[in-house]
Amino acid sequence: MSVSKIAFVLSAIASLAVADTSAAETAELQAIIGDINSHLSDYLGLETGNSGFQIPSDVLSVYQQVMTYTDDAYTTLFSELDFDAITKTIVKLPWYTTRLSSEIAAALASVSPASSEAASSSEAASSSKAASSSEATSSAAPSSSAAPSSSAAPSSSAESSSKAVSSSVAPTTSSVSTSTVETASNAGQRVNAGAASFGAVVAGAAALLL
């Protein structure tokens, strides 16, 4: 079977894009697919002998296996390629440093705020709980020197304050969790949509390069 190396790499990226990946990996794949769609001629140009582009050995070994197939069953070999293998291939692109790396960085930044917000919520929750504990301790101190009836009021106040803090922390944590899930979900939907259109690009590239 005759399959060009570039068509193989593009097909492998498309295959990985529809697999289960983390939010960060999804964002990076989205950036790569977007760059391929916008600069397909650059990628097709890699097929020339003077491009200087070399496929990493682990990816090349899978490509060599593909060449032994006589039908489309070779696509099952894509499962042998993981995200790291694709990353090692991408960083060898001539325009990785000048163009693609900044696009990937921007894509990763789009999913990082959710993680940052979650961390801030966790710190806020810890601070609130510490304040609640401190307040409860302070309220308990006067009860040892006061009459039993007077100690009940501070204790009740501390309990109410603790419940109020807990109540305020819960919605915040829930909101952040929902935001994180929505961010990952939206990123997944975007890359799936990109992968769908990218599939047509790969088919066209393969037709030109086979």
From Swiss-Prot:
Extensively O-glycosylated. Residues 122-186 are annotated as: Disordered. PROSITE patterns: SRP1_TIP1. It is an enzyme of class 3 (hydrolase). The keyword Nuclease does not apply. GO terms for molecular function: lipase activity; structural constituent of cell wall. It is found in: Secreted, Cell wall; Membrane. Residues 1-19 form the signal peptide. Keywords: Cell wall, Glycoprotein, GPI-anchor, Hydrolase, Lipoprotein, Membrane, Secreted, Signal, Stress response. It is a lipid-anchor; GPI-anchor. Its EC number is 3.1.1.-. Residues 187-210 form a propeptide. Present with 35600 molecules/cell in log phase SD medium. Belongs to the SRP1/TIP1 family. Seems to have esterase activity. Prefers ester of fatty acids from 4 to 16 carbon atoms. This is Temperature shock-inducible protein 1. It comes from Saccharomyces cerevisiae (strain ATCC 204508 / S288c). The lineage of its organism: Eukaryota, Fungi, Dikarya, Ascomycota, Saccharomycotina. The gene is TIP1.
